[in-house]
């Protein structure tokens, strides 16, 4: 099982970014995203609508105390992975990861305690990179694409144009 924590969501600044973090997590097989910062029902509804149409399972949940959540997930047996440009190469460590992974991605400046709580601080390239692209690359490497049996809509790949099939 893979779950995500998006730190420090800010409604005005991060609406699209947090939505894209959630959609990337869903597309690459995560089952849930938690987010901290400002509670944002519009962002939650946007992600839930995509999940309803294109399939799941995938959940969105707001958390006030993300430190307690990280500790709880570790007690439940998850490996806490903090994606940061300052970490070790994720390619060198990906085979050390357990089946249940709790991935932490930043928003605003990440507190030092996150680096201490994480079982792994991993980098995608040791360069400044968006949380969306870093998460996507990481999840693709460890999990590949997700598949969704309960979708109402499926994208039919096309050489040109767009085609959706409704069920």
Protein language model features and the residues they cover:
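Long, charge-patterned amphipathic alpha-helical coiled-coil/hairpin "stalk" segments used as oligomerization
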Residues: 87-124
């Amino acid at each position: 099982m893979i779950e995500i924590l998006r730190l420090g969501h800010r409604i005005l600044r991060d609406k699209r970014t947090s939505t894209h973090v959630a959609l990337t997590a869903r597309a690459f097989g995560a089952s849930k995203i938690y987010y901290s910062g400002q509670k944002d029902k519009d962002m939650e509804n946007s992600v839930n609508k995509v999940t309803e149409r294109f399939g799941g399972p995938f959940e969105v949940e707001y958390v006030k105390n993300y430190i307690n959540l990280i500790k709880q997930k570790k007690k439940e047996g998850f490996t806490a992975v903090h994606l940061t440009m300052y970490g070790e190469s994720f390619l060198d460590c990906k085979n050390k990861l357990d089946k249940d992974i709790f991935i932490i991605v930043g928003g605003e400046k990440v507190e030092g305690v996150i680096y201490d709580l994480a079982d792994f601080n991993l980098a995608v390239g040791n360069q400044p990179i968006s949380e969306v692209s870093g998460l996507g690359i990481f999840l693709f490497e460890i999990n590949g694409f997700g598949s969704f049996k309960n979708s109402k809509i499926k994208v039919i790949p096309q050489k040109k144009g767009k085609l959706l099939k409704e069920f």
